[in-house]
């Protein structure tokens, strides 16, 4: 009697084995946890986990082969982030289940401290940049996307939200204050936060010139617990200067009153690395899905979005996220 030899699916079994191998090391699991809502370069991860560059590179290679991490080039640097689980594909459900369990882990205190150090190093670079270029701020902005190029689209979206006459607004990183007059005309009270004294002085001068009596300027880190809350929180070309954009959205969410809105104007992902030196950008724009995912993780709901193409090749995304009246479950 002839017996049929079963045909093994080597490709599928290899893929499953690769995923199991990647999840079988404590350091790799902690790397996945650290990448939950952030992205880091190889040197940053080596610093965070106090290990050699070659060692962390090996672990990242194993994670990449298992499709647990993805890479994105930021100028001359390559940053790693978690890859999204595609549950409709083979191993996708196991991938998703692994990440769910990883998210229940708590990173060791020393790892969390080193992550904070990396974030502070990024923030210091951004702060130093704005201290140097305050006098040429507008010229620097115009290299990529000046306010007039997206003002009408942003105002159209803002006006469609029909805020009450008593509503309040908070602008994070107002720059030279170019958008403050528009907010002052639409809201009863406007607060503008900046951690750069030089930039806040430019905003103060504009407020004085235009007589914006209902605008309050504060020299304060927007992520500070003492920051004010408002019905509408606005970030115009600011998020790419934050050390940890996903964490920034999460920490800004409590600043939005229940039922209120977060308006983010940002660059779409690009590869113009000169923007780092010329404009102090820590991140070269963002993928649309990343902003939506970070907002959702913070408990915000996606609403209307507008996308603009510029002649210089850059694309702008104007995004609206709403904080629901009832709290959502936040991962």
List where the protein language model places each region.
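A short glycine-rich, Lys/Arg-flanked "PGG" loop and its adjoining helix->strand segment in the class I
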Residues: 247-261
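C-terminal alpha-helical "lid/dimerization" subdomain adjacent to the S-adenosyl-L-methionine
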Residues: 261-320
């Amino acid at each position: 009697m002839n017996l049929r030899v079963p045909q093994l699916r080597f490709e599928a079994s290899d893929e499953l084995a690769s995923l199991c191998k990647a999840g079988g090391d404590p350091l790799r699991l902690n790397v996945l946890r650290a990448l939950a809502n952030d992205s880091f370069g190889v040197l940053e991860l080596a610093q965070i986990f106090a290990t050699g560059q070659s060692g962390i590179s090996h672990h990242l290679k194993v994670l990449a082969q298992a499709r647990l991490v993805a890479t994105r080039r930021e100028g001359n640097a390559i940053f790693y982030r978690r890859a999204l689980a595609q549950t409709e594909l083979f191993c996708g459900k196991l991938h998703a289940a692994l990440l769910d369990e990883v998210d229940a882990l708590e990173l060791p205190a020393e790892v969390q401290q080193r992550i904070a150090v990396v974030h502070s190093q990024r923030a210091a670079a951004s702060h130093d940049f704005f201290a140097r270029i305050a006098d040429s701020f507008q010229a620097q902005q115009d290299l990529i996307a000046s306010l007039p190029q997206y003002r009408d689209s942003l105002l159209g979206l803002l006006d469609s939200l029909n805020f009450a006459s008593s509503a309040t607004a908070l602008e994070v990183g107002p720059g030279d204050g170019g958008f403050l007059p528009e907010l002052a005309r639409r809201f009863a009270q406007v607060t503008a936060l900046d951690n750069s004294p030089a930039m806040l002085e430019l905003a103060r001068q504009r407020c004085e010139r235009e007589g914006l009596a209902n605008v309050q300027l504060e020299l304060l880190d927007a992520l500070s617990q003492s920051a004010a809350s408002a019905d509408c929180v606005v970030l115009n070309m600011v998020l790419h200067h934050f050390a940890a954009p996903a964490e920034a959205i999460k920490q800004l969410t409590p600043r939005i009153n229940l039922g209120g809105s977060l308006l983010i104007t940002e660059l779409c992902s690009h590869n113009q690395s000169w923007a780092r030196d010329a404009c102090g950008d820590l991140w070269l724009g963002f993928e649309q899905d990343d902003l939506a995912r970070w907002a959702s993780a913070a408990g915000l709901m996606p609403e209307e979005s507008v996308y603009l193409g510029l002649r210089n090749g850059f694309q702008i995304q104007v995004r609206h996220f709403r904080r629901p009246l009832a709290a959502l479950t936040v991962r």
